[in-house]
Amino acid sequence: MENKELRKSYFQRIYQSYIPAYAFGGALIASVPRAFKRPYGGPFVPGCLLCGGFNAIGGLAIASGDLTNGSGICTAWSIAYLMINATKSIKSFRLYPIALTTFATANAVGYGKTFMNEY
């Protein structure tokens, strides 16, 4: 029982920090050169820049001490990424698009849970 509580508290603590937001934003912005080539199943350039940039802004809000608004921003833009790219990335069955979709799902769930607990 104690191990389950430890994992739960770790999951809650990691999504009360800005690290996942910066990591996902950085991964999306780093994938812009790849998005110019338009790989099958991969994200497109405006989606990378918008979702990555706003996740970084959400991380900045969390780093500034505004956990509620920062986690709300990260949740909204992670869900936006999923709405735009989830279906085609899963259908492509390629590693990089599926990894980004998994990262977006984890951020949406983690920061969404944090937002609901704070709000």
Swiss-Prot record:
Record has Membrane as a keyword: yes
Membrane topology annotation: Multi-pass membrane protein
GO-annotated biological processes: heme biosynthetic process
Secreted among keywords: no
CC terms in the record's Gene Ontology section: mitochondrial membrane; mitochondrion
Superkingdom of the source species: Eukaryota
Family: Belongs to the AIM19 family.
Protein name per the record: Altered inheritance of mitochondria protein 19 homolog
UniProt organism field: Schizosaccharomyces pombe (strain 972 / ATCC 24843) (Fission yeast)
